[in-house]
Amino acid sequence: TGAAGFIGWKVSTLLLEEGYRVVGVDNLNDYYDVKVKLWRLDTLKSHENFKFYPIDIENKQALEVIFQDNHIDAIINEAARAGVRYSLENPFVYLSTNTLGVLNLLELAKDFGTRKFVQASTSSLYAGQKMPFVEELPVNTPISPYAASKKGAEAMLYSYHYLYGIDVSILRYFTVYGPAGRPDMSIFRFIKWIYQEEPIELFGDGSQSRDFTYIDDIAKGTIKALKPLGYEIINLGNNKPDKLIYAIELIETYLGKKAKINYKEFHKADMMATWADITKAKNLLEWSPTVSLEEGIKNTVEWTLKNWDWIKDVKL
């Protein structure tokens, strides 16, 4: 699900390259500019083993048709309303997609005998905990409706694992970036703004840090999580927090331009820092990240410039 989304697209791409049949689902909503989603989707449609359904995971009846038409061995649920700040403006859609949408998929997995479920979750759940974040920390105090909706999904997944034996891998992703990334996230926005010589919007002073994790690493970890694990929550992160201002400096270097910074007040629903402990991913999935922030931002800048003919028109 979320096949035209950032992570769903890359996971689908790698699975198709490995020879799997992929059934992609996406509602192509306009939370961010659909041009980016359509570009991703076009690259997937060139594969003969890719079948696409333009539907919403909130629509159980439409989902049921997919399960009737296809034998689904595993569900990788990357469909979600994303974005911490927007969840304060429209909390209802976060619950209906991120929690009730998961329930729809679980009911169909139960009814049609799909034994494996990989769920995209978030480092946002760790707000207020001590770093580096380990999976066993109690994450009972989400500071945004977005985080709360993902916590609800994790809890529902446990119930269905316990009751019906569905094998569940929950992946808590840490700040994912890279080529064809989300235009609502800082790296995409900063590259576009700096290249166009427009001022960038920076919430806070840039000293906040993120465990930036490159898209290819995230997608490979997600595919490794298809193995039978029972019920496990696993961090996928770079295990190395970097200050936001450092990411900006890297973008300046690779573009050969200086950023004009428009400082804004730090947002209450944002976290000051994220840092993943990835011991569990190493042990259970034999996964660890391979792409440094320097290399990842360089790749992202190069991809942006190569595709500038349509990216220049992407709304931020």
Model-derived regions: residue spans:
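A glycine/serine/threonine-rich, flexible loop-to-helix segment
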Residues: 132, 183-191
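Hydrophobic alpha-helix immediately C-terminal to the catalytic Tyr-X-X-X-Lys motif of short-chain
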Residues: 152, 156-160, 190, 247, ...
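N-terminal Rossmann-like NAD(P)+-binding domain of SDR-like oxidoreductases, especially those catalyzing
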Residues: 1-176, 299-307, 316
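A conserved pocket-lining segment of Rossmann-fold NAD(P)-dependent short-chain dehydrogenase/reductase
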Residues: 87, 136-141, 166-179, 190-213, ...
